[in-house]
Amino acid sequence: MIKKKNKKSYTSVYALGQYISMSTHKARRVIDQIRGRSYEEALMILELMPYRGCYPIFKLVYSAAANASHNKGFKETNLVISKAEVNQGNTVKKLKPRARGRSYPIKRSTCHITIVLEDISFYEQYKEYDEYFMYLKKPGSSNENKNLTCYDTYSSGGLWDKK
């Protein structure tokens, strides 16, 4: 198994909630509403949405902001949810007894939720330099590979034959 090395980001903080007893589809329905929003706006949305999955996600977003303010000293007003993902966890399988000696299977699904908050005050400090770097870039240039030909000046005789 190949593991990718994660670059340490000095502007992001995360909170991970594992084995939350909720379907991944129901959690994604809520997560899609808050992805890319500011911290305060996400809390307001989560408080007003009528779904059962909002409360564990609310606790995770609040925990990620507490990690940001305590561990790295970020202000909560500058935080934005840069990444929010829901992955499938284990499924707990039980048998419920029924009439005449039969049983009925019950599947209880769980999910893992990751919330990543990013501090945008770092980007606002260097916003004035974006205009400077914009002028350095050539208009119409792209990063595509272009066919470059290398001319050999020594074998052509044009440079060294003249004395």
UniProtKB/Swiss-Prot annotation:
The keyword Ribonucleoprotein applies. Transmembrane segments: none annotated. The lineage of its organism: Eukaryota, Viridiplantae, Streptophyta, Embryophyta, Tracheophyta. Belongs to the universal ribosomal protein uL22 family. Part of the 50S ribosomal subunit. InterPro entries: Ribosomal_uL22 (IPR001063), Ribosomal_uL22_bac/chlpt-type (IPR005727), Ribosomal_uL22_bac/org-type (IPR047867), Ribosomal_uL22_CS (IPR018260), Ribosomal_uL22_sf (IPR036394). It comes from the Eukaryota. The keyword Ribosomal protein applies. Its main location: plastid. GO terms for cellular component: chloroplast; large ribosomal subunit. This protein binds specifically to 23S rRNA. It is found in: Plastid, Chloroplast. Keywords: Chloroplast, Plastid, Ribonucleoprotein, Ribosomal protein, RNA-binding, rRNA-binding. CDD domains: Ribosomal_L22. GO terms for molecular function: rRNA binding; structural constituent of ribosome. PANTHER family: CHLOROPLAST 50S RIBOSOMAL PROTEIN L22-RELATED (PTHR13501), LARGE RIBOSOMAL SUBUNIT PROTEIN UL22M (PTHR13501:SF10). This is Large ribosomal subunit protein uL22c. PROSITE patterns: RIBOSOMAL_L22. GO terms for biological process: translation.
